[in-house]
Amino acid sequence: MKLFELQPAPGSKKLPKRKGRGHGTGNGKTAGRGHKGQNARSGGGVRPGFEGGQMPLYRRVPKRGFTNIFSKVYTEVNVSALNAFDDGTVVTQELLKEKGIIKKINDGVVILGNGELKKKLTVKAARFSKTAAEKIEAAGGKVEVI
């Protein structure tokens, strides 16, 4: 077999429908748009959420709640993810980002207790859950709130 002999599997390449190219195609004249009306025109159609003049759902449903501008968003990391580090490592928020465990630090990192920790680490983070702190200390590590 040579490179120039390669071809796609039969039936894997389908030609697009050529609309408005004669009635023999089954898609001639109106090109599948029907006769006249808003949807037959170029740029025709209604905006998303428009219900034909009836009061739309997004306006019938009441507004609720607000976004608290003072809320803190923490990036969550489980203790099982900390096994990626070597024994005796000082794990910081920046190191977690560098290693690719988290994408963004946000307002800080919170360590949660899901999974098992098999390494002895010193972990520095904004917050720790009770179980996470217990598991880190049980593995012989240290917990430091920053």
From Swiss-Prot:
<dbReference type="GO" id="GO:0006412">
    <property type="term" value="P:translation"/>
</dbReference>
<feature type="region of interest" description="Disordered">
    <location>
        <begin position="1"/>
        <end position="57"/>
    </location>
</feature>
<protein>
    <recommendedName>
        <fullName>Large ribosomal subunit protein uL15</fullName>
    </recommendedName>
</protein>
<dbReference type="GO" id="GO:0019843">
    <property type="term" value="F:rRNA binding"/>
</dbReference>
<dbReference type="GO" id="GO:0003735">
    <property type="term" value="F:structural constituent of ribosome"/>
</dbReference>
<dbReference type="InterPro" id="IPR021131">
    <property type="entry name" value="Ribosomal_uL15/eL18"/>
</dbReference>
<feature type="compositionally biased region" description="Gly residues">
    <location>
        <begin position="42"/>
        <end position="52"/>
    </location>
</feature>
<keyword id="KW-0694">RNA-binding</keyword>
<comment type="subunit">
    <text>Part of the 50S ribosomal subunit.</text>
</comment>
<keyword id="KW-0689">Ribosomal protein</keyword>
<dbReference type="InterPro" id="IPR005749">
    <property type="entry name" value="Ribosomal_uL15_bac-type"/>
</dbReference>
<dbReference type="InterPro" id="IPR030878">
    <property type="entry name" value="Ribosomal_uL15"/>
</dbReference>
<keyword id="KW-0699">rRNA-binding</keyword>
<dbReference type="InterPro" id="IPR036227">
    <property type="entry name" value="Ribosomal_uL15/eL18_sf"/>
</dbReference>
<comment type="function">
    <text>Binds to the 23S rRNA.</text>
</comment>
<dbReference type="GO" id="GO:0022625">
    <property type="term" value="C:cytosolic large ribosomal subunit"/>
</dbReference>
<keyword id="KW-0687">Ribonucleoprotein</keyword>
<dbReference type="Pfam" id="PF00828">
    <property type="entry name" value="Ribosomal_L27A"/>
</dbReference>
<comment type="similarity">
    <text>Belongs to the universal ribosomal protein uL15 family.</text>
</comment>
